[in-house]
């Protein structure tokens, strides 16, 4: 469950965009529109009760992956709506993987299926979203992603995990890299 050191979500890691009011910024309003119907869903909000990486809640991690996947796909003209949605739902599971053991396979290859099943219960998913959620742990999952948006989520997920693990010590480095990214690519 959520540790006492987990801080409330105010923005995506490394971002200076204030998520407390998503409607005040044009880019954030566009991001929010992509997530209509799922961002405030009770099952998604429950992710805030679970720790993902060190002091990051699973909800914060999912928003991090969702937001940066949205930005990258938007920048290249890819399906940023599906990337934002799949990024938010890619870790929609409610067990502690450090405690729960699976007989079939390890957590890395099993939880994408659990997340996909849970996501299907709360919203309709398109083929890109299904692929991205199901294969976001590639190469731990045997089949590689089929769509470019799925690859974006796969790699953004890994980058966010590294930043979340290192956040306390190296937050300045992450912020510096994200500033350079924003100056170079984001509108």
Language-model segments: residues:
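Metal-dependent phosphohydrolase cores
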Residues: 1-187
């Amino acid at each position: 469950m959520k540790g006492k050191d987990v801080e409330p979500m105010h923005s995506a890691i490394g971002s200076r965009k204030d998520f407390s009011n998503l409607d005040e910024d044009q880019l954030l309003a566009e991001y929010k529109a992509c997530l209509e119907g799922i961002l405030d869903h009770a099952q998604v909000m429950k992710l805030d009760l679970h720790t993902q990486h060190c002091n990051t809640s699973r909800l914060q991690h999912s928003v991090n992956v969702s937001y940066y996947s949205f930005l990258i796909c938007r920048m290249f003209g890819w399906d940023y709506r599906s990337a934002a949605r799949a990024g938010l739902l890619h870790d929609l599971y409610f067990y502690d993987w450090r405690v729960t053991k699976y007989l079939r396979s390890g957590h890395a290859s099993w939880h994408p299926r659990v997340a996909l099943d849970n996501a299907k219960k709360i919203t309709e998913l398109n083929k890109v979203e299904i692929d991205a959620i199901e294969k976001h742990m590639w190469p731990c999952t045997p089949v590689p992603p089929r769509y470019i948006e799925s690859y974006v989520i796969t790699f953004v997920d890994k980058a966010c995990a590294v930043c979340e693990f290192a956040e306390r010590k190296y937050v300045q480095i992450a912020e510096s890299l994200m500033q350079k990214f924003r100056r170079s690519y984001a509108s």
